Amino acid sequence: MNIFELDKELIPTKTTRVLVYPNITWQKDLEQDSYVQVLKNMIRELKDKDIFWTILSPQHIDGLDFDNTEQLMWELPTYPPAMRSHFDVMKFKKLVGHDRDFDLVMSHLPEHTHQLVNTLYNLTHHTPKVIGYAHWFDFDHVCVWAKDSFKQNICGLLEMDKCYINTQTQKNMVLEQARNHFNLQTIHQLDEILTVQYLGVKEEDILKEYEPEHEKIIVFNHRPESYKHYKEFIQLMDELWEQRKDFTVWVPLLTGEPDRPYLTNEKFDKQGYYDKLKTCCVGFSPKQKYGGWSVATTDGMMNGCPYIMYDGEYYHELWDGADFFTTDQEALDLLNRYLDDSDYRFEMQMLGMHHLSTKLNYKNEMETMYQDFCDLINNTKSTNSDKTNELIEVIKDRGSITKRELFNEYCGWGRGIKWTPYRRALMEHPNIYDVNNSEPKYIWSAS
């Protein structure tokens, strides 16, 4: 750690402390898990804010290792239905402890949010507001296991003040299925909680050198699963292969040995993945049962690869100006045009990157989310009591004191008395600050 980093840890700030609860569905490669990618981009875009992130992780994840993060080990089962059911109350209580502070909980796993809040509020001193991010719903037409967790997901959402969701299409699907189980008052509450947040791209990630050169590669960089219509895509590629044999199909997430002469599943690190996308002629965005945002599509577009897209509302939300198909023949006609007409392909490449830059700038979404953070924290109840004034005087006299010291030496109350309102009162005081570090420290600053 360099001197600058040491100094940064001692700088008084009005730190916002966020506890992040994970949702891991791709344990084969945690760095590529969609939750990890989303959270990493959030932290990067909010790096200039005074936020410290405490992240529960099944193992250390390099991609979430920043100056303003810590990772606490929290094991989760790998099978999704087991992962959504398993919650170790006593281990969670020990992890969050009394020595840490949390102004906000961000739950990426709605199915656990009730257990999470129940444990925090009833077994610890913490009572923070809860915000969420929904990565997955067990929709009736998608769920492949014998018993779904949809109702548990909805009950978890109802514990939140706000929960972000990828697309309006997906939100509509949630509300529609929820009507089968919940009354209209609850549906209205869900409608208020669920907030569409598009997963845009960072401006600096958009290709700036517009080169029309490319290879005749069709990329399918989605998960090769049934809910992404992978089988139907391969059948379409078989038909295209019957027409012409001058192309390859790259499916980077395909495991095992490719079983077609045109298939490749080359693996790269993230930069290598981006570099490979730059060489592709066209990407394929399939019909999907889930209605979510396609990070795979924006990955390709920002690297200069245009995509043809299934004519679904979720893709129109991403870019209404793309080339859409509804039938196999329409898809084949479009693929042939992109493979043969370099000028047209280059035109669509340019239009796509311009759209990303002007309409899907992730920084704008993150500024809105940060304001949501501030609004929720500002609405957290604070105390105004003799004990509050006593704590203020202690911090003033000591100059600085850690949360552990303050709690052990001057509080001494049971878990029935909640700390969060006292922290809120301290942080609202004009002369009291925290530090951007894993250990909370209250600092008196007259400036």
Task: Say what each PLM segment does.
Residues 285-298, 309-319:
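Nucleotide-sugar-dependent
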Residues 158-193:
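A short, active-site helix/loop in glycosyltransferases that binds the activated sugar's phosphate group
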Residues 1-62, 238-240:
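N-terminal subdomain of nucleotide-sugar transferases
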Residues 18-21, 164, 209-228, 234-238:
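Conserved donor-binding/catalytic core segment of Leloir-type glycosyltransferases
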Residues 34, 342-381:
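A charged, aromatic-enriched C-terminal amphipathic alpha-helix characteristic of glycosyltransferases
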Residues 275-292, 305:
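Acidic donor-binding loop of glycosyltransferase active sites
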Residues 169-170, 188-206, 255-256:
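Short beta-strand->alpha-helix junction loop in the catalytic core
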Residues 107-113, 134:
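Short His-centered aromatic/hydrophobic patch
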